[in-house]
Amino acid sequence: MALTDSKKKATSKRKRDEPEQEQTHTLTSQLEMLTDEEGDDDNAGDVSDDGEYDEFPEIDAESDSEEEDEEEDEEDEEDEPDISDEEDSDSDESLHVFPKAKTVVSDITGQQKRVYPEIEPDYDSDSSTEDSPNRVGNVPMHWYDDLPHIGYDINGKRVLRPAKGDELDKFLATIEDPDSWTSAFDKKMQMDKPLTSEELDIIQRLYAGENPDATYDPYEPMVEWFTGKGKEEIMPLSAAPEPKRRWVRSKWEKQKIMKIVRAIRQGRIVPNKPKTSSKQFEFYSIWSSEPSSSQPPPLPAPKRPLPTNAESYNPPEEYLPTEEEKQEWLKQDPEDRERDFLPQKFSSLRHVPAYDQFIKERFNRQLDLYLAPRIQRVKLNIDPNSLIPKLPSPSSLKPFPNYRSLLFTHPKGRARCVSVSPDGAWAVSGDEDGVVSLWEVNVGCEIRRWKFEGKIGSLEWCPRADACYFAVGIEETIHFLIPPNLDPTVLALTQTLLAPSTLPPAPATPSAVKWSSSSLSSWSVEQPILSLNLPPSSGLPTQISWHKKGDYIATVSSGGAQNGVWIHQFTRRHSQAPFKKIKGAVQQVLFHPIKPHFFVATQQYVRLYNLAEQKLIKTLQPGIRWISSMDVHPSGDHVIVGGYDRKLCWFDLELSEKPYKVLRYHSRAIRSLHFHPTYPLFASSSDDGSIQIFHARVYNDLMTDPLIVPLKILRGHQITDGLGILQVKWTPKHPWLLSAAADGTVAVWCS
């Protein structure tokens, strides 16, 4: 094949050179034809360095037809195997480019196979630097910080972490080991490895700012790729036609030239200006200019405003003030006056007296220039009424209570608590003398009076419509009373609920609260039908809170924190303390009107618990030093909290744990808060002897904020011993309000 290829190349070259040989007959006549053996030894067509031409090898005559070429190719192919075999044998014996293979018998197939020796790569090999014992790949090595090994080798075995010395070993290594200064830390092997001479040479070159390649020659001769002899560019790089701007005068150059022409005409540019000798020494004054300062120069002083017609000695009549304007100007503060003087009128200039404020005005002017900043502050004349939010008129938000219709009196003590029946016809109130009075709301007539030993802490009417009774809290006891003159059906249901003939089974866990009910045969209206004896040292019950359905009642006592809160169930006749440990002293508790949630107000926080799941939902942060009262909106989404520091906080439970709005309308401590069950109203009472009535409209749209409008301030109670109105309650069906005060009176406020 090699001989055949050489013959074909020679034949094709001969065909290309025939036209050239005819034109340069004189040149080819000097060439000598060589034999086949000589042609194989020399390079065809090369020119020697001394200017003589090399001799061409012998070229066979080309065939006349394609058939002869095909026959010659077939003959060459027949002779080719022998030639290639001989060449292969000669090359194997003479040149050992590749390692020799050994012929062995395979243990698996039993046939002969060639086995080559293992390749030992040098430094130039691609695999010499990649053959690392640790084959974990390009992963962060801090994954192996807590492991005894640092990776795996090619066989899947662990590569153990090399031992590391302390700081003393590192210091000794820098002194004793000469290779420590030429070593680098290998992250993959977690050890120091010495750098090779090639790597050190690269570091030195980079440090010196040289090319890191050692074979780079910055002074190699230039290779003329495009400008050498015979390599010149003849055709243009771009054959685009010439643009029109080549023959049109430039508009911008014309403007620049005209600018120079105008400067020459005006004399700002002198074409033939005489040259002055720069060697001539010029004298100048060293004190002509002040030394430069790094600080910016001071701002110039503001100029005095020019006088107006009002400052004339004979101003027009419209500039002269009247007596009312003079009095108003004198009453104003000097900084609020529009002018510092009052215009005056004189018949002539000689009648004008000396300006009495001249020295003061000059002194203020000097102070302004010396001390005042260079700024003019204009006082904003804003109407304070424009800053007040626009609220609807209270007359459009009626009905709400605005006058006192009747007054019920407890002659021997403070009226601490009051409550209204679910139908709104009856009211019950208690004082510190232990007297509980039942009276009619419309006329104030007292129907029944009960006397207990000890002061009344709290009382509350049961919210059930099919039963009629109320609870009274005295020292460590809760009594349940039935009012007289009830319907027989309602009375029978109430007696069955409070004193059933068959008691429910006792609970598995005994309670510290003892339930004791009177027998129906010996019971009378003058005595309680049911009593709950709280644990000892519980103290006075300060609050009684009913669940909406009337089956549960929660009490808060003034005793210890562990026995302070109790929840009682009537159907099971069982009492339990919902909290084993309470953070802070409990002030008030409330049931959620819709959900099984429980509000607990301590001194500074209001916590919302889920009684069904027994977990804390959220903690409200009113920012009050000491919480005194609390109430929940009938929708259950809003809570109002009052404190002894005169703050009233409105919370939106869906919005945030911080108050939505804080109201400060009372001058003294807030004692009681209450939402109206049906009307958009709520009231707050305080020790200042006043009752604040607010309109509180809550929208179903969550994107609309509640509307809170103050409506009326009710005053009708006397402040006694620093205490004012202790509790307020709304009637369920009318916009009427009942208030119990420290002066021993209970008032009914009607619309």
Curated annotation (Swiss-Prot):
Pfam family, one: BOP1NT
Bias kind Basic and acidic residues: ranges: 323-336
Ranges of compositional bias, category Acidic residues: 34-92, 119-129
One term under GO cellular component: preribosome, large subunit precursor
Entry's Gene Ontology BP terms: maturation of 5.8S rRNA from tricistronic rRNA transcript (SSU-rRNA, 5.8S rRNA, LSU-rRNA); maturation of LSU-rRNA from tricistronic rRNA transcript (SSU-rRNA, 5.8S rRNA, LSU-rRNA)
Single GO term (MF): ribonucleoprotein complex binding
Chief place of localization: nucleus
Region annotation Disordered: where it falls in the sequence: 1-140, 289-336
WD repeats: from-to residues: 410-449, 536-580, 582-621, 622-661, 665-704, 720-751
UniProt xrefs under PROSITE patterns: WD_REPEATS_1, WD_REPEATS_2, WD_REPEATS_REGION
Compositional bias ranges of the Pro residues kind: 294-305
Keyword Phosphoprotein: no
Disulphide bonds in the chain: none
Xref: InterPro entries: BOP1/Erb1, BOP1_N_dom, WD40/YVTN_repeat-like_dom_sf, WD40_repeat_CS, WD40_repeat_dom_sf, WD40_rpt
Keyword field: Nucleus, Repeat, Ribosome biogenesis, rRNA processing, WD repeat
Subcellular localization(s) per the UniProt record: Nucleus, Nucleolus; Nucleus, Nucleoplasm
Similarity annotation: Belongs to the WD repeat BOP1/ERB1 family.
HAMAP family recorded: BOP1 (MF_03027)
Complex and partners: Component of the NOP7 complex, composed of ERB1, NOP7 and YTM1. The complex is held together by ERB1, which interacts with NOP7 via its N-terminal domain and with YTM1 via a high-affinity interaction between the seven-bladed beta-propeller domains of the 2 proteins. The NOP7 complex associates with the 66S pre-ribosome.
Function comment: Component of the NOP7 complex, which is required for maturation of the 25S and 5.8S ribosomal RNAs and formation of the 60S ribosome.
Protein name listed in UniProt: Ribosome biogenesis protein ERB1
Gene name of the record: ERB1
